[in-house]
Amino acid sequence: MASISATLPSPLLLTQRKSNLTSIQKLPFSLTRGTNDLSPLSLTRNPSSISLMVKASGESSDSSTDLDVVSTIQNVWDKSEDRLGLIGLGFAGIVALWASLNLITAIDKLPVISSGFELVGILFSTWFTYRYLLFKPDRQELSKIVKKSVADILGQ
């Protein structure tokens, strides 16, 4: 469960013993004095500061997709016969990423070429959105293409 806590100085939220926290009470969570582990929001006030602690009430679905990615990588690593080749491929990928970032940085410093590449990028993004993302049958076609490419890469 995630939680966030903050301590704010008194002058930011209180003016002459009048609280500016009345708008918080209109929100759909409970506002209590003191710390209560069961409530999603706890507010405590002492003369010098206001402490606010917020806790998440549920789990996010992002953790399940992270576990799927980790399990997929573990399966590929376990099934591999040439682990040295996988390590070399990973290292080559990192070097290629580093080199391409340096190349892009060098091109970006040139005055006219970077503007031309931005125009090409905008035009390509517009075409891709119109071709694959605007209408439902085109989105389904893109989904099939991506699934086929992933299956080809993973050897399934």
UniProtKB/Swiss-Prot annotation:
Query: Which residues does the entry place in the Stromal compartment?
Result: 56-83, 131-156
Topology within the bilayer? Multi-pass membrane protein
State which ranges are Lumenal (membrane side): 105-109
Q: What happens when the gene is disrupted?
A: No effect on growth behavior, leaf coloration, grana stacks or photochemical efficiency of photosystem II. Curt1a, curt1b, curt1c and curt1d quadruple mutant shows disorganized thylakoids with extended stretches of unstacked membranes and broader stacks made up of fewer layers.
Q: Where are the transmembrane segments?
A: 84-104, 110-130
Keywords from the UniProt entry? Chloroplast, Membrane, Plastid, Thylakoid, Transit peptide, Transmembrane, Transmembrane helix
Q: Does the keyword Chloroplast apply?
A: yes
A GO cellular component term found in this entry reads: chloroplast thylakoid membrane
**Transit peptide interval:** 1-55
Q: Which InterPro entries match?
A: CAAD_dom (IPR025564), CURT1 (IPR033344)
Where is it localised?
Plastid, Chloroplast thylakoid membrane
| Oligomeric and partner information | Homo- and heterodimers and trimers. Interacts with PSAD2.
Give the family per the record.
Belongs to the CURT family.
Function description? Determines thylakoid architecture by inducing membrane curvature.
Q: State the protein's name.
A: Protein CURVATURE THYLAKOID 1C, chloroplastic
Q: Which gene encodes it?
A: CURT1C
